Design a protein with these regions (language model features):
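C-terminal leucine-rich, beta-strand-based interaction scaffolds used for sensing/assembly
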Residues: 2-7, 319, 323-429
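Short, conserved phosphate/pyrophosphate- and ester-handling motifs at nucleotide-, phospho-/glycolipid
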Residues: 23, 52, 290, 416
C-alpha cells in the first residue's frame, strides 16, 4: 500500500504544534511579544523560511496553548500569569489597495474560525468554543456554528456606521472586547493577525491606524516578506515605540533544525518509513535552511519510495530525486517559475545559473546576500552569452516572476531564495 507523503511532510502552513520543528529563539520571542501589555508584533523574512507556520504557532500561544513551548524545553519562559487572547487571523491579497480596503475586508470576513465577524456579538448567532490543537489542555477559541436568522447583519451590540469602515471596525472591536474577550472568555485581549501584509498595494497610513487601535486589550501582529519593519509598514515611525518587544525576523534554519524536520517526519510515519544514516543530513544540505524546500524534497523521496517499494529512504532514492530535480521533473511549481524566467533562451539560462551560484556574503539584515551582475558578466561572455544586457531585463520583469529585484545599479537580489537554490541544483536549460 502506498504511503501518504502528507503524513510526515507538507508544503502547507504548519498549524499543528506537533509538526513544528526548531526555531527555539523565535519561540522565546513569541512568548515575550505576546506577554507585553501593549505592542505590535512584526514577523518578516524571505520566502520559504516558514513565516506563516510560525504565525500559526503564535496564534496557538496567544490562546494559552503552550505545548510547543514545553516540548521545546522552554517551560521556564512561560510567565506565571501568561496573557491570553481571542484571535482573528486574516490572509491579505494583492487586490487590497490600502488601509481602508483592508479594514473593509476585516469587518466583512465570515470565516467561521478565523474571521473578525464571527466574534461580533449577535443574539441569533450560535458560537461554540473549540481547540485549534490536538492537545486536551489547549486554550479555546470561538467559532461560528450557525449565523442565525439575521445572517451576518450587525446587532444591537455593535453599530455599523454607514460609509465609515474605520469607525465600524472600532465599534466591532470594542463590542468583541467587552462581550467575548472579557465577559464570556475572561481573556486579556484580542489579537488580530494579518498574514501576507506585504502584498497590500498602498500601506501608507497603516502604521498610524494600527497605533491608534492598539490598546492593552487589542494587539496586532503583521507578517510578510521583507528585510525589516520598513518593508512591511510604510509609516513605520508611527509604531516604533509599540514594537520594541515584538520584532521577529525569520532567517533560514540551521542544518541541525532542517535535519529535525526529517526526524520529526520519521516519528509521524510511525515506523512505516525509515531514513538511512546520513540521509537526513543530505536532505538538509540540499534544502539550505529553507523548511519549505526540505519538505518538498522529503515528499518527493516518499513518492520515489512508493514507486520502488520498501520502507527505507536511502542514498539511492535521494539521488533519484536529485536526478529528477536536475532534469526539471521533480518540482513542477519551481520548474514553471524557472522556465518562465529563462523564456527558452540558453543564454539567459546560463546567466541565471551564474547569478544563482555567485558567492554572496550574509549579513545581519540580508541573510540571502545580493548578486552583482559584473561579477558574472565575463564568465557569461566566455560561455557564449554575447548580449548580457539584452537577456537580463526579463529576469527583473514582474510578468515573468520576477526572479530578481534590482537593488542598485548592477546589484540584484533573488526574490525567492528557494527558487535560487533550485536553480543551483538544476541542470542548465
Amino acid at each position: 500500500m502506498a504511503i501518504d507523503p502528507e503524513v510526515g511532510f507538507t508544503a502547507d502552513v504548519i498549524r499543528d504544534p506537533g509538526r513544528f520543528v526548531g526555531r527555539t529563539e523565535l519561540i522565546k520571542d513569541c512568548i515575550t511579544a505576546l506577554n507585553a501589555t501593549t505592542g505590535l508584533i512584526s514577523v518578516f523574512g524571505k520566502r520559504g523560511v516558514g513565516k506563516s507556520s510560525l504565525l500559526r504557532q503564535l496564534q496557538q500561544m496567544a490562546l494559552g496553548e503552550y505545548a510547543l513551548v514545553k516540548s521545546a524545553g522552554l517551560t521556564n519562559y512561560i510567565p506565571t500569569r501568561a496573557r491570553s487572547y481571542l484571535t482573528v487571523y486574516y490572509t491579505c491579497d494583492a487586490l487590497i489597495k490600502d488601509g481602508r480596503d483592508l479594514i473593509s475586508r476585516l469587518i466583512n470576513d465570515q470565516d467561521p474560525e478565523d474571521g473578525l465577524l464571527r466574534l461580533v456579538p449577535n443574539d441569533g448567532k450560535d458560537i461554540v468554543e473549540f481547540s485549534r490543537s490536538k492537545e486536551v489542555s489547549a486554550g479555546a477559541d470561538l467559532k461560528v456554528v450557525s449565523w442565525g436568522a439575521k445572517g451576518v447583519e450587525s446587532s444591537k451590540y455593535a453599530k455599523v456606521v454607514p460609509n465609515d469602515v474605520i469607525q465600524t471596525f472600532r465599534n466591532f472591536v470594542s463590542a468583541i472586547v467587552e462581550h467575548q474577550v472579557q465577559r464570556r472568555m475572561h481573556r486579556d485581549g484580542l489579537l488580530i493577525i494579518l498574514d501576507e501584509f506585504d502584498v497590500i498595494q498602498d500601506k501608507q497610513g497603516l502604521g498610524s491606524l494600527i497605533k491608534s487601535l492598539s490598546t492593552p486589550q487589542v494587539k496586532f501582529a503583521v507578517c510578510g516578506v521583507g528585510r525589516d519593519l520598513n518593508d512591511l509598514i510604510a509609516d513605520h515611525a508611527s509604531v516604533e515605540r509599540l514594537i520594541e518587544q515584538g520584532v521577529l525576523a525569520i532567517r533560514p534554519m540551521s542544518l541541525a533544525e532542517s535535519e529535525g524536520i526529517i526526524y520529526r517526519a520519521a516519528e509521524l510515519f510511525k515506523g512505516t518509513v525509515r531514513f538511512a544514516p546520513g540521509t537526513a543530513a543530505a536532505i538538509a544540505a540540499l534544502g539550505q535552511g529553507y523548511p519549505y524546500f526540505v519538505q518538498l524534497i522529503g515528499k518527493q523521496c516518499i513518492n520515489e519510495l512508493n514507486s520502488r517499494g520498501g520502507d527505507t529512504i536511502d542514498d539511492e532514492i535521494l539521488q533519484a530525486v536529485v536526478s529528477g530535480l536536475k532534469a526539471g521533473k521533480a518540482f513542477p511549481i519551481l520548474e514553471t517559475a524557472y522556465q518562465r524566467a529563462i523564456g527558452g533562451s540558453e543564454g539567459r539560462a546560463i546567466l541565471l545559473h551564474l547569478l544563482a551560484e555567485q558567492a554572496t556574503e550574509a549579513s545581519t539584515t540580508d541573510e540571502i546576500g545580493r548578486v552583482v551582475l559584473k561579477n558574472s558578466r565575463t564568465v557569461a561572455e566566455e560561455l557564449g552569452v554575447q548580449f548580457v544586457d539584452q537577456v537580463m531585463p526579463r529576469l527583473v520583469e514582474a510578468r515573468y516572476g520576477p526572479v530578481l529585484e534590482r537593488i542598485d545599479q548592477g546589484v540584484y537580489e533573488f526574490v525567492n531564495p528557494v527558487l535560487r537554490q533550485y536553480i543551483r541544483l538544476r541542470d542548465i536549460g
